[in-house]
Every structure is written in structure tokens, then in C-alpha cells.
């Protein structure tokens, strides 16, 4: 009976280990899902403001050529007011998809908040940034010419690390945001 009891004890121990392993795996999956939700914009599927802030909080000096671009959708308030918030949401999703389709997978594309988006292009130069922005504009025009009622229009500003002696992503972000705001004001003046 002692051998039988220890065999039963072993079986119970094995079952306990299996149950604990399954529970740990479920918990790890749930934690990963919670982390994804914490850093992912539910509407667009892009990294959200928290993910953007986490990248910006890295205060390391940038060692390889990096660019930061800030986009702000134009007329989102007008679309929300005249066509409804669901139309505004569709415009945001459409623009997010456009950004993700144009910018290389290696680069960061996030929704900073509301109608603002942030892109970080790694290992780049000015010529590549210009080329990507030109491609974005062409793709935007194609989308807008398909007869879609929701026309994409945006202001953007960008900064690149090679223009600064020592830069962090936060420095690039602040400069890009400032240039974006200047471009937005210039567009408003031209449209008056």
C-alpha cells in the first residue's frame, strides 16, 4: 500500500503541475492581451498615445539618422459636425491605413491622439523622407479621386536628427510638431 500511495501521490503531483502550467500560460496570454490593449488604439489598430509617449520618453541621444513626422488631419471637426462622428471615425481609420501602407514596416506609425499621428523613420536621410512624403501625397490623391465623400487632407511637419548636434526623439517631436502647426496656419491663411 505504501507503493500504491506514493504512485497516487506522484499522479496528483503531476496533475497539479499540469494544472499550474495551464493556468500560468492562460495568465501570460491575458497579460499580453492587456498590454497590447494598453498600447494599441482600438479604432485604428495603431500604437496609441501611451505607446508614442513611451518612445518619446527614451532620452537617449539618437545615434543613427532618424526622422519624426507629425500629421494633423484637416477639417475633422467640420466632418464631425456636418456628417457625424462616425464619418470622422471612418476618416481617421482611412488615414491610419494610408499611413501604414506607405511607411515601411520597420518604422513606427502611431496615433498620438484625436486627429494627430506620429511617424518615426529609422535609418533614413532627407531624400528618403521627401520621397516617402511624396509617395504619401500621391496615394492620398488616388484615394481622394475615387469619388469617396471623405477627402483626406492633412498638415504635417517633420524633423531629422542630422539637423541637430545632439537630439532625442522628444526634440525631434517638438520640432516636427512646431513645423506642423506652422504649416497648418499657413494653409488656413491660404484658404481664407
Feature locations, PLM:
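A short pre-motif secondary-structure segment
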Residues: 108-111
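PAS and PAS-like sensory/regulatory domains
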Residues: 150-155
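Catalytic-core segments of nucleotide cyclases and related cyclic-nucleotide turnover enzymes
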Residues: 81, 85, 130-137, 141-147, ...
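Juxtamembrane or sensor-core-proximal signal-transducing alpha helices
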Residues: 10-35
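Membrane-interface helix-start motif
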Residues: 1-6
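Short helix/loop segment flanking the catalytic signature motif in cyclic-nucleotide metabolism enzymes
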Residues: 91, 118-136
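Active-site-proximal alpha-helical element of nucleotidyl cyclase-like catalytic domains
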Residues: 87-106
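Conserved nucleotide-binding and Mg2+-coordinating catalytic segments in signaling enzymes
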Residues: 32-54, 71-85, 93
Amino acid at each position: 500500500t505504501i507503493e500504491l500511495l506514493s504512485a497516487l501521490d506522484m499522479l496528483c503531483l503531476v496533475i497539479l503541475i499540469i494544472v499550474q502550467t495551464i493556468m500560468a500560460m492562460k495568465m501570460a496570454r491575458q497579460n499580453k492581451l492587456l498590454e497590447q490593449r494598453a498600447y494599441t488604439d482600438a479604432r485604428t489598430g495603431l500604437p496609441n498615445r501611451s505607446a508614442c509617449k513611451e518612445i518619446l520618453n527614451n532620452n537617449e541621444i539618437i545615434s543613427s539618422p532618424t526622422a519624426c513626422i507629425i500629421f494633423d488631419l484637416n477639417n475633422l471637426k467640420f466632418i464631425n459636425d456636418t456628417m457625424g462622428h462616425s464619418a470622422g471615425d471612418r476618416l481617421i481609420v482611412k488615414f491610419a491605413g494610408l499611413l501604414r501602407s506607405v511607411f515601411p514596416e520597420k518604422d513606427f506609425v502611431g496615433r498620438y491622439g484625436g486627429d494627430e499621428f506620429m511617424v518615426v523613420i529609422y535609418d533614413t536621410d532627407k531624400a528618403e523622407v521627401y520621397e516617402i512624403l511624396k509617395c504619401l501625397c500621391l496615394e492620398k490623391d488616388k484615394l481622394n479621386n475615387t469619388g469617396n465623400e471623405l477627402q483626406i487632407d492633412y498638415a504635417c511637419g517633420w524633423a531629422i536628427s542630422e539637423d541637430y548636434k545632439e537630439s532625442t526623439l522628444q526634440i525631434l517631436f517638438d520640432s516636427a510638431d512646431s513645423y506642423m502647426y506652422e504649416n497648418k496656419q499657413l494653409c488656413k491663411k491660404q484658404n481664407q
